[in-house]
């Protein structure tokens, strides 16, 4: 986490709505820090069980995606040549943080997409954790280079990955994409569903605590026709 930022700053505060606290998660995670959006614009996140807004997020723009994509491209130059041992160390720290905050992640998914807490814990959060555990297991013995006949097959990281994930398995779909990307030396720009973005933002805190180099993982919230389209079209995203 860069100097001058804190988890409280990153996650905003809380406001009162109908006698209930509304979480404010108004920052994006870009280049290793929680940052303000280029242009202020907010969206209420609805708890489907109560049909009430329980959180506010910022909606990003093309400018936010551009900032994240350029950060990811800069980071790719060095992250793509890190050793397997280095990447395993970061993955293990993410796994440890994931395990420690599993109840928080499950609770957040219950709030944002309505899964009962047992299902959110056993089938949502735990399965998401499995993707990171499996990525680390495979990476430990994966042959990135091997001889085939008279030639050598070398597997290299593809570049900057633009990831757009849905609401119904919000953390599982994030993990199933982010884990192999980080394991293989790719960098990431993630847009979680604006309908259920809070578990992904909590996951970003775990990534931050793991100490990944700035720009390796970036998160920008927003709608499909704006942030999603910008990710799909950005020249720095492979």
Can you say where each PLM-predicted feature lies in the sequence?
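Terminal low-complexity tails and localization/encapsulation signals of metabolic enzymes
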Residues: 2-56, 89, 93, 143-164
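Residue-level signal for inorganic ion chemistry
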Residues: 51, 87, 109, 132, ...
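Glycine-rich phosphate-binding segment of PLP-dependent enzymes
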Residues: 65-81, 104-112, 138-139
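Long amphipathic alpha-helix in the N-terminal Rossmann-like dinucleotide-binding domain
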Residues: 70, 92-103, 115-141
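Short linear capping/connector segments at secondary-structure termini
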Residues: 108-116, 145-150
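Rossmann-like NAD(P) dinucleotide-binding subdomain of oxidoreductase/dehydrogenase enzymes
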Residues: 143-238
């Amino acid at each position: 986490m860069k100097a001058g930022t804190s988890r409280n700053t990153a996650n905003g505060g809380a406001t009162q709505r109908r006698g209930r606290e509304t979480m404010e998660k108004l920052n994006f995670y870009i280049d290793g820090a929680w940052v303000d959006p280029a242009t202020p614009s907010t969206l209420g996140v609805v708890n489907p069980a109560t049909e009430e807004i329980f959180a506010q997020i910022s909606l990003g723009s093309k400018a936010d995606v551009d900032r994240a994509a350029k950060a990811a491209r800069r980071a790719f130059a060095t992250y793509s040549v890190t050793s397997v041992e280095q990447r395993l160390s970061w993955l293990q720290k993410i796994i440890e943080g994931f395990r420690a905050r599993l109840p928080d992640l499950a609770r957040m998914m219950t709030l944002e997409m309505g899964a009962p807490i047992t299902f959110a814990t056993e089938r949502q959060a735990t399965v998401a954790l499995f993707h990171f555990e499996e990525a680390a297991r495979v990476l430990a013995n994966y042959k990135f280079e091997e001889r085939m006949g008279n030639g050598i097959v070398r597997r290299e990281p593809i570049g900057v990955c633009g990831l757009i994930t849905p609401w119904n398995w919000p953390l599982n779909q994030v993990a199933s994409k982010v884990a192999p990307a980080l394991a293989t030396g790719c960098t990431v720009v993630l847009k979680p569903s604006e309908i259920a973005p809070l578990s992904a933002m909590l996951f970003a805190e775990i990534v931050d605590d793991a100490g990944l180099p700035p720009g390796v993982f970036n998160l920008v919230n927003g709608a499909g026709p704006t942030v999603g389209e910008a990710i799909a079209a950005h020249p720095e995203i492979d």
